[in-house]
A protein has these predicted regions:
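Selective transmembrane helix interface/packing segments
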Residues: 1-247
């Protein structure tokens, strides 16, 4: 039994200093597939909208937008409507990246680089609102409170926000992958112990691997993936709201 990270599928050699070669990994390919599928779904749901005689497709699109608006308003208020597309994009991308493993492709959320990229975007927005609300000088002065020797700890506290968000999402998704893999291996071993003595092909059939892994996959890939996407987006909304000085 082996647990490996994303494989490097292709390497583009460059002469750019400090950047090195550009590697095409499973994470990158799967992410682009998810983005292409989500873009196609959005185009399909959003075209041909009508004011009357609304189709089921349009009703589904309106339901998604309404629920997303309500989510942002409940967590951020009515002054942050410009972030509805961002929150919705992160939520959809997170769910898509979690569920793509169901069809046998590598899950981008099992790679820390994916969550780190999302967390960096959120961190930049948090810093933007803190500086916009308090001013650059007041923000820098706040890093020295209550005394200047606390500056390293205050800086670490600022950086810990995106780090904790990334590792929380990544850790929960990875743990689900590890548990599913261990269970699959354990069931294979159990099948071999109990039925390996049977003659011919019957002894090679992994009976305990039929059906049981599907239930764990249903939980970790579907339910768990949706919960983690919801938590990440909720934290994003709350942190941006607090950075803007809203209570």
């Amino acid at each position: 039994m082996e647990l490996n990270g994303a494989k490097i599928l292709y390497t583009i050699h460059t002469d750019i200093p400090f950047l090195g070669d550009f590697k095409i990994t499973q994470t990158l390919v799967s992410t682009w597939i998810v983005m292409a599928l989500l873009s196609g779904l959005a185009i399909w749901l959003g075209h041909g909208l009508k004011l009357e005689n609304v189709s089921k497709r349009q009703a589904a699109a309106e339901f998604i937008v309404t629920r997303l608006d309500q989510f942002v308003h409940d967590n951020m208020g009515y002054h942050f409507d410009q972030y509805i597309p961002l929150i919705g994009s992160i939520f959809a991308l997170s769910i898509g990246c979690n569920l793509i493993s169901v069809v046998g492709l590598w899950s981008p959320t099992a790679d820390l680089n994916t969550e780190a990229a999302w967390a960096i975007v959120v961190f930049v927005l948090i810093m933007y609102y803190k500086i916009k609300t308090n001013g650059i000088l007041s923000y820098l002065k706040g890093l020295l409170d209550p005394i200047f020797i606390m500056a390293p700890i205050n800086v670490l506290s600022e950086v810990s926000t995106p780090v904790s968000m990334a590792f929380r999402h990544f850790g929960n998704i990875l743990s689900g992958t590890v548990i599913s893999t261990l269970l699959y291996w354990a069931l294979a071993s159990l099948s071999h112990v109990l039925f390996g003595w049977l003659p011919g092909v019957l002894g090679d059939i992994q009976l305990f691997q039929i059906g049981i892994p599907a239930f764990t996959g249903l939980y970790f890939d579907w339910f768990g993936g949706c919960i983690q996407a919801f938590i990440f987006c909720t934290l994003t909304a709350i942190f941006i709201k607090r950075a803007a000085g809203e209570e």
